[in-house]
Regions:
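A solvent-exposed, acidic/Ser-Thr-rich amphipathic alpha-helical stretch
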Residues: 164-206, 212
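Hydrophobic pocket/interface hotspot
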Residues: 158-159, 166, 242
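Short, flexible helix/strand-to-coil boundary loops that buttress conserved ligand/catalytic motifs
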Residues: 36, 162, 170, 260
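Alpha-helix boundary/capping residues
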Residues: 31, 162-165, 202, 263
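Short, solvent-exposed coil/turn elements at secondary-structure transition points
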Residues: 50-53, 172-174, 228, 250
Length: 263
């Protein structure tokens, strides 16, 4: 395998790569770590929460759908809470089935350090994901009922659907802290009562959010609001024991434009 690397006066030079897989993994891993460090710094600077892009698996087709079927929005959000190094070790070990020695060479860390990072990542994900499982039918029922209740501003009904310690996360974009005329939406809303009150206020101030379309995102039931033929918001949840534990609302147009919106 040949690779182009920058040389003098902006020209590239060709080098032979003996181990293409290792070279590609190292290059991509380094680029991802740099981007993660940069993204983490941007999030801290903006003091807002960002959500991963919702993924329409139907647009990928084939093996990709099967491989990504278990990557729920809740799991991707949990991954974001790991440090870049923890995330890299977890994915390289679990997805690419690399040994600790291979990962250590890639990240320039000792095997012991990689084992420790993997252990921390697994422990964190296990503690956060514990109990966040429900049947697809129950998941869909809770989602549709919650979307209807929130759209109509029905606080009492929302309270019957939300867990007491539920969390609402709204991503309005890298610079946005406003939803319509409602300010300060860059931080999660904690607790069922606060979430219901907040969404009731949204329903009063933004009565025509668009047409609600049921779809599947990240392998899970979801609802996308469509306005003038374009996605305006995507709503996903995680649930356990018959109650909604997390509500994820993506309204950043830059992270919605790729959705297929198939009928």
């Amino acid at each position: 395998m040949s690779s182009r690397r920058p040389g003098c006066a902006g020209r590239g030079r060709t080098v032979e790569v003996d181990a293409p897989r290792a070279f590609l993994l190292q290059t991509v891993t380094r680029l991802c770590l740099n981007e993660l460090d940069s993204a983490r710094a941007r999030r801290e600077e903006s003091r807002g929460d960002r959500l991963p892009e919702p993924v329409d698996l139907g647009l990928l087709g084939g093996d990709a759908v099967e491989a990504l079927d278990q990557i729920s929005m809740a799991f991707l959000v949990l991954l974001q809470r790991l440090t870049p190094a923890e995330r890299a070790v977890l994915l390289l070990h679990e997805v690419f089935e690399m040994s600790h020695s291979e990962i250590g060479a890639l990240l320039e860390k000792s095997e012991a350090a990689c084992r420790q990072l993997l252990g921390r990542a697994r422990a964190h994900l296990a503690s956060e994901r514990r109990g966040l499982r429900t049947s697809r039918e129950e998941h869909r029922r809770l989602l549709l009922a919650f979307v209807e209740a929130s759209r109509n501003g029905e606080m009492d009904r929302m309270l019957t659907l939300l867990a007491e310690d539920a969390t609402l996360v709204i991503d309005t974009g890298p610079d946005g802290k406003r939803l319509g005329r409602i300010r300060n939406v860059g931080r999660p809303v904690e607790g069922a009562t606060r979430i219901a009150a907040f969404l009731a206020a949204v329903a009063r101030q933004i009565p025509a959010f668009g047409e609600a379309r049921e779809c599947v995102l990240n392998g899970e039931p979801a609802v996308v609001y469509v306005r003038e033929g374009r996605p305006a918001a995507a709503i996903l949840i995680s649930a356990a024991e018959g109650r909604i534990r997390r509500v994820f609302v993506q309204v950043d147009a830059g992270r919605l434009g790729h959705l297929g919106l198939r009928q």
